[in-house]
Amino acid sequence: MISRTYVINLARRPDKKDRILAEFLKLKEKGVELNCVIFEAVDGNNPEHLSRFNFKIPNWTDLNSGKPMTNGEVGCALSHWSVWKDVVDCVENGTLDKDCRILVLEDDVVFLDNFMERYQTYTSEITYNCDLLYLHRKPLNPYTETKISTHIVKPNKSYWACAYVITYQCAKKFMNANYLENLIPSDEFIPIMHGCNVYGFEKLFSNCEKIDCYAVQPSLVKLTSNAFNDSETFHSGSYVPSNKFNFDTDKQFRIVYIGPTKGNSFHRFTEYCKLYLLPYKVIDEKETNDFVSLRSELQSLSEQDLNTTLMLVVSVNHNDFCNTIPCAPTNEFIDKYKQLTTDTNSIVSAVQNGTNKTMFIGWANKISEFINHYHQKLTESNAETDINLANLLLISSISSDFNCVVEDVEGNLFQLINEESDIVFSTTTSRVNNKLGKTPSVLYANSDSSVIVLNKVENYTGYGWNEYYGYHVYPVKFDVLPKIYLSIRIVKNANVTKIAETLDYPKELITVSISRSEHDSFYQADIQKFLLSGADYYFYISGDCIITRPTILKELLELNKDFVGPLMRKGTESWTNYWGDIDPSNGYYKRSFDYFDIIGRDRVGCWNVPYLASVYLIKKSVIEQVPNLFTENSHMWNGSNIDMRLCHNLRKNNVFMYLSNLRPYGHIDDSINLEVLSGVPTEVTLYDLPTRKEEWEKKYLHPEFLSHLQNFKDFDYTEICNDVYSFPLFTPAFCKEVIEVMDKANLWSKGGDSYFDPRIGGVESYPTQDTQLYEVGLDKQWHYVVFNYVAPFVRHLYNNYKTKDINLAFVVKYDMERQSELAPHHDSSTYTLNIALNEYGKEYTAGGCEFIRHKFIWQGQKVGYATIHAGKLLAYHRALPITSGKRYILVSFVN
């Protein structure tokens, strides 16, 4: 049994505390009472909390991304350590027994159905020493793990430490490992302690006594649907150590940036420096050139700093934009510099290619000698050569007087992007490689087309999207909500104006402008009205876009972008309101490698894109910076439309455009014309699919299922036993109306021992009291449901399995008069859907389904939830008898 449950919770997150306590209350209502302790987490963003611990961080950076530990990861690691210490203290002072079992939970977990029953069943299979048992995790290579018994595996490397059970012996081993002397993320430390290799850091704990570790399969808990988006661990800044000792070096590293500070790319440059803990100094060279600026900076350093500072110099022409991304930690720059040089006198530079950017790295004292020597030579010769860093490196390459410069020809450190083929994207490492297989530490662009590629690099590095962690959302909360100028251009749909009424935003802060103008002059005139309105943001909605999410405005504001818009898609077509790339030969659409992943929401995030139209939110400062947003100029391609002009002008002024597909915000529908409609529209019914698809989905599909229809990766489904899953599919309205249709038709078959069924043309081995969907005219609608809603989920669930056809679809009624149960059987299907249509415990009692080979009974399925399992040979099952009432289920055999 579980002796005590620790729930790690930040004191400043009472919302998460209330949610997890509600989970324990649900268990209590089912007769399961856990001794729960809300354990105050260490807040990694609170220096006072961190000062309580004497800890050191080794030279830790994540091997995949190069990122250091975040404040949240430090706080999380110290929180778990504190729990382990409390367990040891409680055992040693007698408040816990030595043979105790301790459940450790983070506050974003959810107990799965029959948690305690399944926990007892699973743990009864453990007949060997087990120090730690994972109840939920993310295994990196699940297919290589050894299965010990039906529900227990021997884990390899796993991520997450959100739910596990430990013994006193385990806690003591953790305490004896000197974890605080080598603090790394807790979900890296635990695998090391059960024998996994983690980037070489296992050497730090090589002398520690290892634990016996196992994991349940399937999991007994899950994470909340927004666990990652609301994660303190992932979504906090990089931890900045208080001294250099923590990074095992007495040397310094510094970036000196000389160049313009205008445009979004400079802000991005500084954000990457902060992420990777790269110290930087900015020199805006408006008054002098880069040579003079750098010489002056070096002269200001002490001799000690000159001798101990490895300096990376990034110089950008003042007529250009920064467009440079550093994406590596300090130690990587130091290591690569050592690899590329033979001694400390050398300076490593990017390949000189006549760009507006100059980059090199070397020890500050040697750079100072190099510059002073060059300056002295020019002075002695009275040369009139233009003195700048680019010329300095050019001369060094052809003069024997300057032989200390080594060019980084393979792009180990510096990679100029000319076109997309220069780099290779990764969806798992938050880094990119070049075509030689090197992983550059600095990437930069110099042309319009290469800047578009560099902006894609932003999407997959830093805080961008990653296959393991998704996208890091840092919502900005406003103390005072900004004023909004809402501009709506009506084309066909007059009802689009209702968005102003449905927006979840204070109406007194919205100025609404509605226009029917079809002339391009409308746009430029409209932003002039905006500037006079006193509003802070310009929010534009085109008349062919239907907004379905009332919170869209608040959510776009929270992204804190200068220019941002939601994904708008036309049905299931590939037509959307954004372009992932632009053809440099004509200025029009070019498909990007990730276009379909983004519009299908297989990858969810906020994306830097080159073109965005139809719906967008613009900060006032952008319009003040680029007042002629919609004006055509000589640099544009012939035939550029108004949206192309807007995006061209934004790109030219280094204003990034961001596309959010974090939520389903709405869609494009240019075919509707509600102006001609009169009277009250009729209520949508079961039969109105697909003719009234949007309304049908909203009324009948479960909101959770509908919101994940384009991307099931984070969908909230449960594996109730091996390869049997439960998930929300329909609303109670759907279930209620299906029962009403069936009872009204009154076409129920005899069931029971009536084996001949003329509806299916022969003998039914396991007859039920049912009505086929085709008998009530719902077969075509069900076909649409299976192939457009269920089949995409099945592809996600069963390794891209493609649904072929529907064998049968029918509603079964179990009652006390005619048939209350069904004998054990296999279904004649590849997979079977079973949807609960009425409420367990209220409209019927007992019943349910027993999966005989799994030794598992599934009762109490929620209304509208579907169970999906394999048919034919694998899922041998039976319907258990009800004891009162009537039980309705919708069953479909699918191949």
UniProtKB/Swiss-Prot annotation:
Keywords, alphabetical? Dioxygenase, Iron, Metal-binding, Oxidoreductase, Transferase, Vitamin C
Lineage top rank: taxon = Viruses
- List its EC numbers: 1.14.11.4, 2.4.1.-
Active site residues of this protein: R887
Q: Which InterPro entries match?
A: Collagen_mod_GT25 (IPR050757), Glyco_trans_25 (IPR002654), Nucleotide-diphossugar_trans (IPR029044), Oxoglu/Fe-dep_dioxygenase_dom (IPR005123), Pro_4_hyd_alph (IPR006620)
Name any cofactors this protein relies on.
Answer: Fe cation; L-ascorbate
GO molecular function per UniProt = iron ion binding; L-ascorbic acid binding; procollagen galactosyltransferase activity; procollagen-lysine 5-dioxygenase activity
Instruction: Tell me where in this chain the Fe2OG dioxygenase domain is found.
Output: 805-895
Q: Does the keyword Cytoplasm apply?
A: no
Output the PROSITE patterns linked to this UniProt entry. FE2OG_OXY
| UniProt-annotated stretches for the region Glucosyl transferase region | 537-895
Location of the region described as Lysyl hydroxylase region in the Swiss-Prot/TrEMBL record: 1-194
Which residues are involved in binding Fe cation? H825, D827, H877
Q: Does the keyword Iron apply?
A: yes
Reactions listed under catalytic activity: L-lysyl-[collagen] + 2-oxoglutarate + O2 = (5R)-5-hydroxy-L-lysyl-[collagen] + succinate + CO2
Question: Which Pfam families does the UniProt record give?
Answer: Glyco_transf_25
What this chain does, per the record? Displays two enzymatic activities involved in procollagen processing. Forms hydroxylysine residues in -Xaa-Lys-Gly- sequences in collagens. These hydroxylysines are subsequentially glucosylated by a glucosyltransferase activity. Collagen post-translationally modified is detected in mimivirus virion.
Q: Which PANTHER family match?
A: GLYCOSYLTRANSFERASE 25 FAMILY MEMBER, PROCOLLAGEN-LYSINE,2-OXOGLUTARATE 5-DIOXYGENASE/GLYCOSYLTRANSFERASE 25 FAMILY MEMBER
The name of this protein is Procollagen lysyl hydroxylase and glycosyltransferase
This protein's species is Acanthamoeba polyphaga mimivirus
